[in-house]
Amino acid sequence: MRTPTFPATFCLVAGLCLASACGGSSGPGSVGRVAEAPDPAQAIDAALDAGTPAELREGLAAAIVIDVSGSMNDRVRGEDGRRTRKIEVARRAARDLIEQFVGYAEKHPGEPVMLGVYEFSRRSGQPDLRPIVQMGPPDRAGADEAIARLQPDGGTPIGQAMLAATQALNATGLTRRHLLIVSDGENTDGYTPEDVAAAVGRRPEGERPSIYLVTFDIEARRFSPLKDAGGLVLSAGNARELNQTLDTLITGSILVE
């Protein structure tokens, strides 16, 4: 595996994570909201135990989690230098990521490959983590329409999203797991990202997803506790940096030939 390199403006802090919302329900890999308990570590461990299949098999599974909280309506510098809404930048990035996974799966027909793409935010009456593309073999069919419907609103439950996405990865039974989160804000609701990352680190080696958090237009140093819990935190301040960071992660750490 080759070691990824990043632009100097990015902040690399080590380990696992990428940001979004939600806890899970009682079913394996379900996408929903986990009831918060006085002891977060115990509750998160129990949620992860409930979603782990009995048998593991070789293969690649990835969950891409995209922040759609209200601040994603704000603007950053786009690829063309104009001020562009963050959600529009995220939509384009999501389409590109799906294409990369489709291409990888086509080149490796004998390797099990599964991809799920999710949005997250805290909204009344909705789960924190919501599927854009259900976990399964990479497929571009219908993805464009689903991505086009992404709309910013609500809070930023990054830890809850991480937990629910990890449950979805657990349900695949595949041993090479990656959780990629893109968020432009700090955690506002539910479990903290560092509590979830710490729980992931307690899992058996074959059940631990690598977690990558890309902080979009927010300082990576705000996620120092996540770094201390074993996360890899990367910073991107505009559309070009975001695309470069995601491409380097995908080709250097996730879809490794």
Regions found by a protein language model. Name each.
Residues 9-20:
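Bacterial N-terminal signal peptides
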Residues 1-11:
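Bacterial N-terminal signal peptides that target proteins for export
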Residues 22-80, 167, 255:
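Acidic, polar low-complexity linker/tail segments
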Residues 32-35, 47, 55-182, 218, ...:
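Von Willebrand factor
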Residues 51-52, 75-88, 105, 130-134, ...:
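Second-shell loop/turn segments in exported
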Residues 149-155, 185-249:
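VWA/integrin I-like adhesion module and closely mimicked acidic/polar interface patches used
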Residues 74-75, 104-146, 168-172, 190-194, ...:
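Short beta-strand-loop
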